[in-house]
Amino acid sequence: MKIVAAEFVTSAVNPGGYPPGNLPEVAFVGRSNVGKSSLINKVVNRKGLAKTSSTPGRTQLINFFNINNDQFLMVDLPGYGYAKVPTDVRIKWGKMIEGYLKERECLKGVVLLIDSRHTPTAQDKQMYEWLQYYHVPTVVVATKVDKLSNNQWAKQQAVIKKSLPLSKEHQLISFSAETGRGKEKLLKVLDEFIHKDGINLTAIE
């Protein structure tokens, strides 16, 4: 896949604000400050498309981006796990994220971002288990690998795979928004996602 166009569509807090749902969607999810916006910008070759912030917990909306003139939508979900956000807000975000992932019929796959420098958090593990439980096509992307040496990444790769634990059917892609490492691999996965059949979560339940 080659991305030649990317445009912001809308922001939403509930299904009433979502786009119509006539295009395949791929969602990006991860804890606060994991580098989600930077990854999206790198993948679509647009520096300011997804708003980046040095303040964790800043993204409070579900943001939709149209890719390649209606080929599919990228969906940027709010970051989870930021302790300084009030409890009621964290609960609201959790319901917002789960509601989208569970109810969105045009969802084709999820990109779960994990900071390559750290052991997956309890929230990371919970999200991964949830996606597995509902059989949502998933790829795990380890961000900020440019901060690690090759030896450090080799060790962290093993830690991440063991901690989740990573299913054999799921890939772990090392990614750097600085160098572009992992971009082509991720684009290939996105292409595979949007050509899959739909996910019927209601039927699974």
From Swiss-Prot:
Protein task: Necessary for normal cell division and for the maintenance of normal septation.
Record flagged with keyword Hydrolase: no
GO molecular function: GTP binding; metal ion binding
GO cellular component: cytosol
Residue ranges of every copy of the EngB-type G domain listed in the record: 22-196
Signal peptide as annotated in the record: none
A Pfam family annotated for this UniProt entry: MMR_HSR1
InterPro entries associated with the record: G_ENGB_dom, GTP-bd, GTP-bd_ribosome_bio_YsxC, P-loop_NTPase, Small_GTP-bd
Family label: Belongs to the TRAFAC class TrmE-Era-EngA-EngB-Septin-like GTPase superfamily. EngB GTPase family.
Cystine pairings recorded for this chain: none
Record-linked HAMAP family: GTPase_EngB
Binding residue positions for Mg(2+): 37, 59
Organism: Desulforamulus reducens (strain ATCC BAA-1160 / DSM 100696 / MI-1)
Designated name of the protein: Probable GTP-binding protein EngB
Keywords: Cell cycle, Cell division, GTP-binding, Magnesium, Metal-binding, Nucleotide-binding, Septation
Gene3D superfamilies assigned to the protein according to its UniProt record, in alphabetical order: P-loop containing nucleotide triphosphate hydrolases (3.40.50.300)
CDD domains according to UniProt: YihA_EngB (cd01876)
